[in-house]
C-alpha cells in the first residue's frame, strides 16, 4: 500500500465514482431498504496504527445486512472451531445468494457461510448457545467498533414479512438435518441479525482484527487467533461478494464482504480496513458505486493483495 495522503485519495475516489451513480437500484425485495435515497455515499478508512479518515455519509447508519455474517461466523468459529465445517462448506457457490437448486443437489449442505443458506446454518449453531443470536451478533459488532449498536425494528419486520425464500431454504436444511432448530425461529433470528444498523466508520473499526492479525486496536485485545484471521480473509476473498466474487477480485483484489443495504467492507491485511456505502446495487446485489470506489482506492494506493 503506497504511503499516500488518505484524505487526498478519498477526495479523488469521490470524484471518480460520480459517473456510476444511477447505474443500479436499491434492494426492492426488502421494502424498507427501497426507501433509502440512491445518491447516498460514504467511505471510511481505518489504519491499524490508529489513523482514521472519512468522506461523505460515512457516519450515517444503514442496514448492513449480510456483512453481519462475518460477525456471526467469527462467533461460531470461536466457539466451535473447525466443527462448524461439518455444517457448511468453504467453496464459492457460483449461484445467487438465496438460491435453492445447489443446496438441494448437495443434500442441504451450503457451499459457504456467506450465502443465505450458510448464514442460516451459522445462526442455527449460535442458537445452541443463546436464545437471541441476533443480539449476540449485535453486541459482538458493538464490542469490535467500541460503540453501542442497534437493530432497526422496521427493517427487521419488513425483511421477515418477505422472507419466503429464506423460509424455503431453512425448511430444506431442516429436512436434510443441516439445522436442528425450528426453521421459522432460525429465519426470524437471521432477519433480525441482518437488520443491524452501522455506519462506514463503525464497520471499518469493527473489521480491524482482520487487518491486524486478529488483534482489535479498539478493544485492545486479541479477538481471533492469527490462523483463524487468515482463514476468514481467505473466505472473504473467495466467497464474500456472492457470485460476482471473481469479478470483484479482478477489479479490487481485496478480501471483502458486501450486503444488500449497499455496504462493502474490504480488508488490507497488515494495513487497514476500508468501508464504503452506496445503496444502488448491481444485479448480483452488490453496491455499484461501492465497488467502483474500492476499485479506485485499490488502484491509487496499490493495495491489492493479488
UniProtKB/Swiss-Prot annotation:
Molecular function, one GO term: glutaminase activity
Q: Which domain of life is it from?
A: Bacteria
Alphabetical list of SUPFAM superfamilies matching this protein: beta-lactamase/transpeptidase-like (SSF56601)
Intrachain disulfide bonds: none
The record ties this protein, via InterPro entries, to: Beta-lactam/transpept-like, Glutaminase
Residues reported to bind substrate:
66, 116, 159, 166, 190, 242, 260
Reactions it catalyzes: L-glutamine + H2O = L-glutamate + NH4(+)
Pfam annotation, one family: Glutaminase
- Which EC numbers does the record give? 3.5.1.2
One GO BP annotation of this record: glutamine catabolic process
Similarity-based family: Belongs to the glutaminase family.
Q: What NCBIfam families does this protein's entry cite? A: Gln_ase, PRK00971.1-2
Quaternary structure note: Homotetramer.
In its UniProt entry, what is this protein called? Glutaminase
Q: Which organism is this entry from?
A: Caulobacter vibrioides (strain NA1000 / CB15N)
* Gene expressing this chain: glsA
Amino acid at each position: 500500500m503506497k504511503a499516500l495522503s488518505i484524505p487526498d485519495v478519498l477526495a479523488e475516489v469521490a470524484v471518480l465514482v460520480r459517473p456510476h451513480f444511477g447505474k443500479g437500484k436499491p434492494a426492492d425485495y426488502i421494502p424498507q431498504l427501497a426507501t433509502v435515497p440512491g445518491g447516498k455515499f460514504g467511505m471510511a478508512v481505518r489504519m491499524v496504527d490508529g489513523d482514521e479518515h472519512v468522506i461523505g455519509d460515512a457516519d450515517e447508519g444503514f442496514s448492513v445486512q449480510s456483512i453481519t455474517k462475518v460477525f456471526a461466523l467469527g462467533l461460531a468459529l470461536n466457539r466451535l472451531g473447525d466443527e462448524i465445517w461439518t455444517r457448511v462448506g468453504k467453496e464459492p457457490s457460483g449461484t445467487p445468494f438465496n438460491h435453492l437448486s445447489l443446496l438441494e443437489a448437495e443434500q442441504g449442505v451450503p457451499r459457504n457461510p456467506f450465502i443465505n443458506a450458510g448464514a442460516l446454518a451459522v445462526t442455527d449453531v449460535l442458537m445452541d448457545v443463546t436464545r437471541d443470536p441476533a443480539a449476540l451478533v449485535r453486541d459482538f459488532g458493538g464490542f469490535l467498533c467500541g460503540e453501542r449498536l442497534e437493530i432497526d425494528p422496521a427493517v427487521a419486520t419488513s425483511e421477515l414479512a418477505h422472507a419466503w425464500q429464506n423460509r424455503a431454504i431453512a425448511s430444506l436444511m431442516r429436512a436434510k438435518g443441516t439445522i436442528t432448530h425450528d426453521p421459522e425461529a432460525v429465519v426470524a433470528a437471521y432477519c433480525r441479525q441482518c437488520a443491524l444498523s452501522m455506519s462506514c466508520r463503525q464497520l471499518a473499526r469493527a473489521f480491524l482484527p482482520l487487518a491486524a492479525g486478529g488483534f482489535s486496536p479498539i478493544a485492545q485485545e486479541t479477538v481471533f487467533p492469527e490462523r483463524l484471521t487468515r482463514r476468514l480473509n481467505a473466505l472473504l476473498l473467495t466467497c464474500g461478494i456472492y457470485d460476482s466474487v471473481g469479478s470483484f477480485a479482478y477489479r479490487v483484489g481485496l478480501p471483502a464482504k458486501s450486503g444488500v443495504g449497499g455496504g462493502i467492507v474490504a480488508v488490507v491485511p497488515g494495513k487497514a480496513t476500508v468501508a464504503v456505502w452506496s445503496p444502488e446495487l448491481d444485479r448480483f446485489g452488490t453496491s455499484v458505486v461501492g465497488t467502483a470506489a474500492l476499485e479506485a482506492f485499490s488502484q491509487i494506493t496499490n493495495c491489492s493483495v493479488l
